[in-house]
C-alpha cells in the first residue's frame, strides 16, 4: 500500500484547497448519548466550525439500521448536527451542499489547485475551449459523510447515490485494523479508477499526518489505519459544467468534493 507522505507542504495551503468534512469529539458513542458533530471547513484536518444554514444545504441526514432520519437544526446552530441514535449500529451521516462559486483572478492560483488535487490536463482543455486564463469561475459542491460507531457498531456503510462519494467497504470499529480498511470512491455510482485520495490521519494528541494514494481500476484503495486515530479521506474531480443544467451560478469549471470521516478504536 504505497503512501506518499507530505510534511510542511500542507502548513500554508491557500483557501482554494480547503476541505469540508463532518467532525466530532468522539466518533464512538453509546445509543443513549447525544452525538454532536460539526461541519468543518479548513485544511490539514483543522478548521472552523460552520453554522447550520439551510440555504447552503441540499441534503443532510443520518442513516442507522436501514432507517433514514433528517437532521433537525435551527438556523445558525453550532454544532450543525445533534442527535441521539437510540440504538446500536453503524451510523452514517450524509451531507450534500448547494453549489457555491469562487473566481480565480489569475491562472497560477487555479493551476496550484489543479496540481494539488491532481485534476488532469485542465489547462489544455481550458485553452481548447477558448477560455481566457483570467477570472476563472469555479462552481463547487461538497459531498461529505461521517461513519460513527454506536455501541457494538454492527453494520456497514453503503452507497447513498451522491454525485460522488466514498464508501467504506469494511467496518473500522469492528474489523482488524492490521488488515487496513478498504474504501471505494464513486462518481455517478460508478467506480473512479486511478483517482487521487488524500488521507488525513489525526492522532489522539492532535498531530496530523497527510498522505496520498490512488484507487485501482475498481475505484478501491486499502488505507493503512491505526488504533486510536481519526481519519479524513478526500477526493476531488473537476468537470465542464452541463450548460443544460441549472446547477447554480454560471461557471467555467465545476468541482465535486467527496469526503468521509471515521475513527479506529483504541486497541
Model-derived regions, located:
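Bacterial N-terminal signal peptides
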Residues: 1-12
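Start-of-domain marker
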Residues: 18-73
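Glycine-centered loop-to-beta-strand initiation motif
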Residues: 77-80, 89, 214-229
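Short acidic/polar inter-strand loop motif in beta-rich domains
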Residues: 97-106, 239-245
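Short amphipathic beta-strand segments in non-cytosolic proteins
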Residues: 58-68, 196-212
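Sec/Tat signal peptide C-region and signal peptidase I cleavage site
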Residues: 13-17
Amino acid at each position: 500500500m504505497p503512501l506518499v507522505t507530505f510534511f510542511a507542504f500542507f502548513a500554508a495551503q491557500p483557501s482554494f484547497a480547503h476541505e469540508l468534512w463532518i467532525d466530532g469529539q468522539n466518533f464512538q458513542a453509546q445509543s443513549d448519548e447525544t452525538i454532536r458533530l460539526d461541519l468543518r471547513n479548513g485544511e490539514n484536518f483543522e478548521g472552523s466550525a460552520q453554522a447550520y444554514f439551510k440555504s447552503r444545504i441540499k441534503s443532510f441526514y443520518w442513516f442507522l439500521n436501514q432507517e433514514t432520519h433528517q437532521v433537525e437544526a435551527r438556523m445558525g446552530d453550532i454544532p450543525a448536527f445533534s442527535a441521539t441514535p437510540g440504538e446500536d449500529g453503524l451510523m452514517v451521516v450524509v451531507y450534500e451542499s448547494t453549489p457555491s462559486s469562487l473566481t480565480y483572478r489569475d491562472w497560477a492560483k487555479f493551476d496550484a489547485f489543479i496540481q494539488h488535487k491532481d485534476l488532469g490536463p485542465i489547462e489544455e482543455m481550458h485553452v481548447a475551449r477558448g477560455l481566457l486564463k483570467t477570472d476563472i469561475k469555479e462552481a463547487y459542491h461538497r459531498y461529505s459523510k461521517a461513519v460513527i460507531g454506536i455501541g457494538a457498531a454492527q453494520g456497514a456503510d453503503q452507497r447513498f447515490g451522491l454525485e460522488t462519494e466514498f464508501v467504506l467497504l469494511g467496518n473500522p470499529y469492528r474489523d482488524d485494523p492490521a488488515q487496513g480498511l478498504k474504501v471505494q470512491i464513486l462518481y455517478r455510482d460508478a467506480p473512479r479508477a486511478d483517482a487521487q485520495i488524500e488521507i488525513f490521519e489525526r492522532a489522539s494528541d492532535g498531530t496530523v499526518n497527510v498522505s496520498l494514494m490512488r484507487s485501482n481500476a475498481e475505484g478501491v484503495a486499502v488505507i493503512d489505519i491505526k488504533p486510536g486515530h481519526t481519519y479524513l479521506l478526500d477526493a476531488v474531480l473537476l468537470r465542464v459544467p452541463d450548460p443544460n443544467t441549472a446547477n447554480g451560478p454560471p461557471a467555467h469549471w465545476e468541482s465535486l468534493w467527496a469526503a468521509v470521516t471515521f475513527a479506529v478504536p483504541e486497541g
